[in-house]
A protein has these predicted regions:
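Ribonuclease/tRNase effector modules and their secretory precursors
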Residues: 1-102
Length: 102
């Protein structure tokens, strides 16, 4: 299944969480969780997929997805996140970074 579809479904189902860094960026830019969720649901494509190494020894590599999308009010938001798996199953989408697009 397309990663953007999987991300949007996780967001719509409320299966997402924010890192402390993402929360600080959101606060600095005056964004709320709904702004970030709207921007992801309204996104038309994934801007970039980054391969990264996980700090967990059981996970060899993971992908970070960079998404630019707009809120219903027209504000462009940048977000970067990854899927978190537990027992081999995608549990939720974890947002590492969320801020106004520059």
């Amino acid at each position: 299944m397309d990663p953007l579809v999987r991300i949007k479904r996780a967001i719509l189902a409320g299966r997402y969480a924010f890192s402390e860094k993402a929360r600080l960026e959101m606060e600095a830019d005056g964004l709320i969780e709904l702004d970030v969720a709207e921007s992801i649901v309204n996104a038309v494509a994934i801007y970039k997929r980054l391969r990264s190494r996980s700090s967990r020894p059981t996970v060899r590599r993971e992908y970070l997805y960079v998404i630019y999308g707009s809120t219903l009010a027209g504000l462009m938001v940048y977000s970067k996140g990854k899927f978190v798996r537990e027992n081999g199953e995608e549990v939720y989408y974890f947002l590492v970074s969320s801020k106004k697009a520059r």
